[in-house]
């Protein structure tokens, strides 16, 4: 509408946006949902699947999982069914070990989710991962450093906290720092909290 100022348009867009922002990683869209359950209306974006590898695995075990990933790729009712992401967890503090596993995962051609709490390991992993990545590792304790790493690399940032209240506070701080490209982990420490 030509009569609205840019500020008014921005405010209107923010107020009418879906409660869950759409995040794009590679060719895939996450979020953008306006309902919690499919029977309420419909889910906007399909569920995406990942295979998990970890620095705690032997190299042979990780290589086998990544090789088997390529076997799950078929078409059903006109829709391609395959594993879209590789989830790469870091359980060590050695950036070189993590970067090597990330390099193997990136070679599959799938988008990556990098679970990493250490800033130096995250930097090493992002150097070999490419752009289609979710850096999953911001917490109330390290969100400033992880936000800087994610913004520099131009990737989505995953945010964790022990409680919903802490998660809310951390997200508010990240948004105030200019990052709205976030994926939130609302999983609690126990099933009851989730």
Language model features with spans:
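Well-ordered, non-membrane alpha-helical segments in soluble/globular domains
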Residues: 59-73, 95-101, 166-169, 193-194
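N-terminal active-site wall of soluble small-molecule enzyme domains
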Residues: 90-130, 142-146
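Short amphipathic beta-strand starts and helix->beta connectors
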Residues: 33-37, 97, 170
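Catalytic alpha/beta core domains of metabolic enzymes, predominantly
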Residues: 141-194
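Acidic (Asp/Glu)-rich catalytic clusters
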Residues: 41-44, 66-81, 102-107, 126-130, ...
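Glycine-rich, proline-tolerant flexible connector loops at the mouths of alpha/beta enzymes
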Residues: 2-8, 53-61, 80-103, 110
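Hydrophobic faces of well-ordered beta-strands that scaffold small-molecule active sites
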Residues: 47-55, 81-90, 110-115, 133-137, ...
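N-terminal amphipathic alpha-helix/helix-capping segment at the start of soluble metabolic enzymes
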Residues: 3-67
């Amino acid at each position: 509408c030509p009569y609205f100022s840019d500020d008014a348009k921005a405010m209107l867009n923010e107020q009418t946006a879906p409660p869950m922002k759409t995040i794009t990683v590679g060719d895939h869209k996450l979020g953008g949902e306006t309902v919690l359950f499919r029977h309420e209306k419909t889910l906007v974006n399909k569920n995406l699947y990942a295979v998990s590898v970890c620095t705690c695995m032997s190299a042979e075990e990780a290589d086998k999982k990544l090789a088997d990933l390529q076997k799950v790729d078929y078409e059903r009712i006109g829709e391609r069914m395959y594993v879209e992401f590789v989830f790469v967890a870091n359980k060590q503090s050695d950036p070189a070990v993590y970067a090597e596993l990330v390099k193997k995962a990136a070679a599959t051609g799938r988008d990556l989710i990098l679970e990493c709490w250490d800033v130096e390991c995250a930097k090493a992993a992002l150097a070999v991962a490419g752009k289609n990545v979710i850096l999953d590792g911001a917490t109330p304790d390290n969100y400033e450093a992880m936000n800087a790493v994610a913004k520099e690399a131009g990737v989505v940032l995953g945010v964790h906290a022990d409680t919903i209240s802490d998660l809310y506070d951390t997200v508010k701080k990240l948004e105030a720092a200019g990052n709205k490209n976030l994926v939130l982990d609302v999983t609690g420490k126990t099933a009851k909290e989730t």
